[in-house]
């Protein structure tokens, strides 16, 4: 799973999910990409699940780039715990994704197969997305 090796602070404030993405809004490495249309927290498990869905569909050939990284810890308090007594322990790692961000990129010779692989990966993500190419941008 993706997660930082070492962090300065174990617990962080929740990042803002409002506004549009400032960078990473165009396809830079591959020919096709998945672009977010809504803000969301994407967990390390969701990123890994989308990556596996893409690689299993394209088999050999092609290349995949992951442009987001889960560097934010989200905390959770145990079940049946009274209010107060501090913040909960870190439970999972998330990437803060804003609308317009290209999260995954892919280069593959056959466009139809590449679009199907990206469509399968989009089903694993917690927000609305769309497939973009190098020519068309947000």
UniProtKB/Swiss-Prot annotation:
CDD domains: Ribosomal_L16_L10e (cd01433)
Domain of life: Bacteria
SUPFAM superfamilies: Ribosomal protein L16p/L10e
Entry's family note: Belongs to the universal ribosomal protein uL16 family.
Keyword rRNA-binding tagged: yes
Function description: Binds 23S rRNA and is also seen to make contacts with the A and possibly P site tRNAs.
Biased composition (Basic residues): 1-16
Entry protein name: Large ribosomal subunit protein uL16
One biological process term in Gene Ontology: translation
GO molecular function: rRNA binding; structural constituent of ribosome; tRNA binding
Entry-linked NCBIfam families: rplP_bact (TIGR01164)
Subunit structure, as described in the record: Part of the 50S ribosomal subunit.
Chain segments carrying region Disordered: 1-24
Annotated Gene Ontology cellular component terms: cytosolic large ribosomal subunit
InterPro entries hit by this protein: Ribosomal_uL16, Ribosomal_uL16_bact-type, Ribosomal_uL16_CS, Ribosomal_uL16_dom, Ribosomal_uL16_sf
Key words, A-Z: Ribonucleoprotein, Ribosomal protein, RNA-binding, rRNA-binding, tRNA-binding
């Amino acid at each position: 799973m993706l997660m930082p090796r070492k962090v300065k602070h174990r617990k962080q404030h929740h990042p803002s999910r409002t506004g549009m993405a400032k960078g990473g809004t165009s396809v830079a490495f591959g020919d096709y990409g998945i672009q977010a249309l809504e803000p969301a927290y994407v967990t390390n498990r969701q990123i890994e699940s989308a990556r596996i869905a893409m690689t299993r569909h394209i088999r050999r050939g092609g290349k995949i780039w992951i442009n987001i990284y889960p560097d934010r810890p989200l905390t959770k308090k145990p079940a049946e715990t009274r209010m107060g007594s501090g913040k909960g322990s870190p439970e999972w790692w998330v990437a803060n994704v804003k609308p317009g961000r290209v999260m995954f990129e892919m280069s593959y010779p056959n466009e139809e197969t590449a679009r199907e692989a990206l469509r399968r990966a989009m089903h694993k993500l917690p927000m609305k997305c769309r497939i973009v190419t190098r020519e068309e941008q947000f």
